[in-house]
Structure formats: structure tokens, C-alpha cells
Design a protein with these regions (language model features):
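N-terminal accessory interaction module
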Residues: 1-67
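Charge-rich, solvent-exposed alpha-helical interaction surfaces
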Residues: 31, 83-87, 103, 138-141
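Amphipathic alpha-helical interaction segments
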Residues: 58, 62, 91, 95, ...
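A ubiquitous short alpha-helical element
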Residues: 68-74
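Short acidic alpha-helix initiation/capping motifs at coil-to-helix transition points
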Residues: 76-84
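Short, surface-exposed acidic
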Residues: 90-105
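Alpha-helical oligomerization segments
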Residues: 101-152
Length: 152
């Protein structure tokens, strides 16, 4: 199974996402569609949460611009779900554990399904746009950069 991991090339995510915080390099990410602001009625300048162009870290819930598609084992995948369940319960006020688990499983499954459409070890970015009463997601794909044995 494939999933997303954060790629930090420099300190720009820390600066861009200073309000929400940046995900850590190598942290598991989810698509983060559940955390998209309502862009209707808000000017682009006022929409400073950057939710339309970022993924969300599973551990620290910081944002990330570039994600790498990588393999994830079943144990790590289950840990992703458990962290999301705790986040939905503790931070977002899910009404029940069952509701939190259902949404966490849905978010993890969506991210895994998304990753299956890409080759392993590519980098992707997201751009979300409102339309037809929903948020549409468009992904750009980039080959992972390497210098010697070092990933860039």
C-alpha cells in the first residue's frame, strides 16, 4: 500500500505555515480535505490558512506543500488511523469514538487510494478549487530529485 510522507526542501513551509505550523520532514501525511476552509465569501488575501495548497501531518497536524508517495506497511497505516482518531476526538470534538474512527478510516483510505494512482517515490502537490458545491483537487506530479545517494 502507498501513502504520503512530508518533503521539506528548506524552511519555506515553516514560514508559509507559521500560523498552523509545518509538518516535519518524513512525517506521514493525509490529503487533509477534512480541514479545508470555506473559501466562499472570503477574499484570496484573507484566506491565509493555506488549506487549498497543502497536506496535513498526522503527528503534529502541521501543513506541508510537497508530499512523496511511498510504501506504508499495515502497522504504520493503523497507527495513522489511530492518530487521526485521537485528533478528531481531542482537537476537533468528534461526538463519539465511532464517528471519529469512521472519519479517520475514510481519510486514510482516501489518501491511500489517491496514492495508488501515482508511482512510488514521486513528489506531488495539491491545488484545491471550489466548484459545483464541492472542493475539487488537482495534483501535480514531479520526479523525486537525487544527488548521489541523497534525496532532495
Amino acid at each position: 500500500m502507498k501513502f504520503l510522507k512530508a518533503v521539506l526542501l528548506d524552511a519555506s513551509d515553516s514560514q508559509v505555515y507559521s500560523r498552523e505550523g509545518a509538518a516535519r520532514d518524513g512525517e506521514w501525511l493525509v490529503s487533509g480535505g477534512y480541514a479545508v476552509c470555506d473559501p466562499t465569501g472570503v477574499t484570496h488575501r484573507a484566506l491565509n490558512c493555506h488549506c487549498l495548497t497543502s497536506f496535513i501531518g498526522v503527528v503534529g497536524r502541521g501543513r506541508c506543500t510537497i508530499a512523496e508517495v511511498v510504501e506504508i506497511d499495515k502497522s504504520e497505516y493503523q497507527q495513522v488511523i489511530e492518530r487521526l482518531v485521537r485528533h478528531f476526538m481531542d482537537d476537533l470534538g468528534a461526538p463519539t469514538l465511532e464517528a471519529a474512527r469512521s472519519v479517520a478510516e475514510e481519510e486514510a483510505a482516501y489518501t491511500a487510494e489517491l496514492c495508488e494512482s501515482f508511482s512510488s517515490e514521486v513528489w506531488i502537490t495539491v491545488k484545491r478549487t471550489p466548484g459545483d458545491g464541492r472542493i475539487k483537487e488537482h495534483y501535480s506530479v514531479f520526479k523525486r530529485l537525487m544527488i548521489g545517494s541523497h534525496k532532495l
